[in-house]
């Protein structure tokens, strides 16, 4: 039995069908029709068993294989065409016009408390001070006794201090002065440090008070230190922080750990010292407390007060930030109001 293959008709039909292919699914269906397990080529190959003549069988098999190669070539070309089309469509879909202005990302801003703390640190570091830190949970000896604060002092009362034990030995520090005590106990004079950090007092939260706030305290120890040294350093700080035109005034006060003690005022930055509502028409605004280190404090840390003298000061970070940035309510510093943060 002799079989013939109409090669031209098969090729022509495939070319017409393949032209109509638009996606990969249609491509796979058509390829299976011709080259699949139940496709045309498989059917033609199965016809070999019906040919008895060996030479005719060889010739027929050769013709089928040649046809198969031609079909595969046509399918390969179409596959490349479809892949290129897919690539172009994907590029078109993902195309970005680089000439369009980009959307600027919002950049975070430091909270004013952090910003102010860094400003203060940079000023004092520039004057030769180093930064020291210590624990917020303190022992009463470091927080009170070593700082010449006797048991009868009002600061040690329950209504002012957060005690963590019934014997009042553990507490949340009420100032960062304990850091100064710890530093002096492990360091030999002379020294100059500032100790920034969180402190805790039993205050109601309002426009000017908070049970948790931030301080920067300073300590300078050397020979022959006097009030004039204290005032000089504070003037440099005030002028760098608030502006060159600021003057400093020391008013006598009382702190158990300094003698003499002072409240430190600056000339009003809002009226230039002429008098206004902010300074209550005095021309001066209080910014911190200071004084010469009490001899009893030096004795607590084994410094000889006859050889060494020093000055100490302490300021509320929130207070000086409120003054510098004209913020009327301390509570604004603790809110996450993005409008306030962006404008500060």
Swiss-Prot record:
Cofactor binding: number and manner: Binds 2 magnesium ions per tetramer.
Keywords in alphabetical order, please.
Answer: Aminoacyl-tRNA synthetase, ATP-binding, Cytoplasm, Ligase, Magnesium, Metal-binding, Nucleotide-binding, Protein biosynthesis
Which PROSITE patterns does the record associate with it?
AA_TRNA_LIGASE_II (PS50862)
Where is the chain membrane-spanning?
none
- Coiled-coil blocks: none
Q: Which GO terms describe its molecular function?
A: ATP binding; magnesium ion binding; phenylalanine-tRNA ligase activity; tRNA binding
Q: What superkingdom heads the lineage?
A: Bacteria
Look up the record and report any one GO term of the cellular component aspect. Answer: cytoplasm
What coarse category fits the chief subcellular location reported for this protein?
cytoplasm
Q: Which GO terms describe its biological process?
A: phenylalanyl-tRNA aminoacylation
**Which residues does Mg(2+) bind?**
259
Catalyzed reactions per annotation: tRNA(Phe) + L-phenylalanine + ATP = L-phenylalanyl-tRNA(Phe) + AMP + diphosphate + H(+)
Question: Gene3D superfamilies given for it?
Answer: Bira Bifunctional Protein, Domain 2
Q: Tell where it localizes.
A: Cytoplasm
> For this protein, what is the EC number?
6.1.1.20
* Cofactor(s) required, per the database record: Mg(2+)
**Family to which the UniProt record says this protein belongs:** Belongs to the class-II aminoacyl-tRNA synthetase family. Phe-tRNA synthetase alpha subunit type 1 subfamily.
Q: How does it assemble?
A: Tetramer of two alpha and two beta subunits.
Entry-linked HAMAP family: Phe_tRNA_synth_alpha1
- Any idea what this protein is called? Phenylalanine--tRNA ligase alpha subunit
* Organism placement in taxonomy: Bacteria, Thermotogati, Thermotogota, Thermotogae, Petrotogales
């Amino acid at each position: 039995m002799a079989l013939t293959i109409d090669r031209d008709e098969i090729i022509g039909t495939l070319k017409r069908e393949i032209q109509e292919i638009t996606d990969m699914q249609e491509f796979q269906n058509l390829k299976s029709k011709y080259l699949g397990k139940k496709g045309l080529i498989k059917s033609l190959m199965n016809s070999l068993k019906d040919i008895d003549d060996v030479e005719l069988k060889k010739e027929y098999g050769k013709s089928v294989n040649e046809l198969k190669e031609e079909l595969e070539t046509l399918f390969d070309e179409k596959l490349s065409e479809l892949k290129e089309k897919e690539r172009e469509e994907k590029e078109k879909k993902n195309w970005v016009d680089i000439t369009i202005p980009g959307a600027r990302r919002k950049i975070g801003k430091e909270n004013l408390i952090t910003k102010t703390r860094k400003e203060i640190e940079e000023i004092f570091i520039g004057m030769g001070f180093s930064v020291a830190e210590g624990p917020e949970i303190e022992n009463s000896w470091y927080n009170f006794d070593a700082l010449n604060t006797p048991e009868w002092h009002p600061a040690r009362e329950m209504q002012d201090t957060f005690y963590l034990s019934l014997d009042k030995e553990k507490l949340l520090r009420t100032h960062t002065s304990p850091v100064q005590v710890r530093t002096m106990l492990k360091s030999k004079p002379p020294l100059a440090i500032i100790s920034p950090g969180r402190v805790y007092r039993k205050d109601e939260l309002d426009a000017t008070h908070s049970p948790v706030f931030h301080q920067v305290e300073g300590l300078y120890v050397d020979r022959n230190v006097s009030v004039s040294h204290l005032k000089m350093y504070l003037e440099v700080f005030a002028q760098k922080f608030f502006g060159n035109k600021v003057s400093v005034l020391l008013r006598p006060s009382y702190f158990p750990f300094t003698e003499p003690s002072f409240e430190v005022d600056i000339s009003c930055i809002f009226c230039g010292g002429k008098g206004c509502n902010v300074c209550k028409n005095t021309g001066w605004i209080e910014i911190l407390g200071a004084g010469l280190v009490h001899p009893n404090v030096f004795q607590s840390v084994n410094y000889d007060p006859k050889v060494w003298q020093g000055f100490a000061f302490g300021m509320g970070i929130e207070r000086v930030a409120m003054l510098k940035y004209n913020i009327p309510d301390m509570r604004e510093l603790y809110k996450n109001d993005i409008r306030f943060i962006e404008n500060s």
